[in-house]
Amino acid sequence: MNLSEAKELNGSLQESAISDGGQLKRSLKLRHVVFIGLAYMSPLAVFDTFGIISDITGGHVPAAYLLIIVAIFFTAYSYGRMVKKYPSAGSVYTYTRKTMNAHLGFLVGWSAMLDYLFLPMINALLASIYMSSAFPGVPSWIWIFLTIVITTALNLFGVKLAVIFNYLLVILQVLVTVIFVILTIRMIMYGDTGNTFSLNPFYTEQLSFPAVFAGASILALSFLGFDAVTTLAEETIEPKKNIPRAIFIIALSAGAFFVTVTYFMQSLFPDVSVFGDIEGASPEIARYIGGALFHSIFISGYVVAVLACGITQQMSASRLLYGMGRDGVLPKKFFGYVHPRTGLPVFNILLVGALALTAMFLDLTEAASLINFGAFVAFTFVNLSVIVYFFRREKNRSVKSIITSIIIPGAGLAFNIYLWFSLEKSAMILGVVWAAIGFVYILYLTKFFKVSPPELSNNDQ
């Protein structure tokens, strides 16, 4: 995709974002949708958790990625099935509401909202980890604060540039990663490390499956966004064909990319305990394989990517809150407010920025687990939606139908539930508390289930 195409696509997305009614223009082709999904995920996400996952799994990060890829593929299949059944702009909130129950759909959407609200927090935390690697004398909270101030300010004053250049940043991130892999391979082959290429990153006699499952439950963070393209169904040409294809292409491309990169990293460093800061293992590896120059390039590229990703995620979260406020799901006076001059939901942008400040009090494992609670709620219920749809709506009871509507989504359901319960205990507690708040709130909204909850408009899901 060239810059002119990015500008053209930016125009259509901006037009869609401010449209309150009517049909959204179908202007997105398959390649556009794939690029949007990859931009949302951020290819450099592969470096985010390498250190902590290697520590948890005992040096089997690629094995943990293979496990989460299986769960993601089953879930991608279920998303594809539901897009074909409900081709309007949708999400797991829509699918649960349509196939099961409006109240349950609200609670699922409420739990999944954790992803949107706290992804900017993860970005700020990652920025502080990488900047602290370059400037160890500066307290990490300063980098967190500066990152949030910058992303919030750009959301308030300069978001259009971020939309255009996100596409260029995807290419930049891939180039930085390719250089990283080449330098890693060179170090394994010609460096005096004593390490070789083997299957040890995937399997050794010391491999612990519970530990690999625990690692995989955190690695779901790397895939957040692969399903976000389902919300573009109304803007995509031939959505029943192109959205399912895009979901699989995004999941397959990202999965192969993550496994390849972490295989070479793990081959070079089977034991990350040699690093003083396990969370910051990736920038230290960059310094080791490429010296101070590549370390600076790596840090610079990563921080720019984090800022761009943070801008997009803060924009998405504030827009979601605005949609819920406008439709009466949340208090309209605050969440439905739009600044009369800028046309932006400024209160929501500031609120998401304030929530991101909680990064000062969490480590990367806790923060990733908290966000993944919402992700596994979404992944679990999209698989369950396919099964429920089969029993309630599907008349075909052939062997093929049973395989595609029960066995495949059932496998995805089982994988995701197991991964869900492999999360950190603190994340499970916070997730359950968040869900309980949502339950109390829906009791208030529906007058103890006497009325249906407000429905979120399609173009904001």
Where are these regions (language model features)?
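Membrane-interface "cap" regions at the ends of multi-pass membrane proteins
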Residues: 1-51, 55-60, 72-77, 89, ...
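Helix-loop-helix junctions that connect adjacent transmembrane segments
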Residues: 19, 24, 58-62, 66, ...
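Membrane-interface loop-to-helix entry segments
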Residues: 140-196, 247-252, 371-382, 404, ...
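Helix-loop-helix connectors at the membrane interface of multi-pass transporters/channels
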Residues: 3-6, 15, 94-97, 124-144, ...
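A generic transmembrane alpha-helix motif of multi-pass inner-membrane proteins
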Residues: 375, 403-461
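TM-loop-TM module centered on a large, flexible mid-protein loop between adjacent transmembrane helices
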Residues: 94-95, 101, 133, 246-311, ...
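Membrane-helix boundary/coupling elements in multi-pass transport proteins
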Residues: 88, 111-125, 223, 228-236, ...
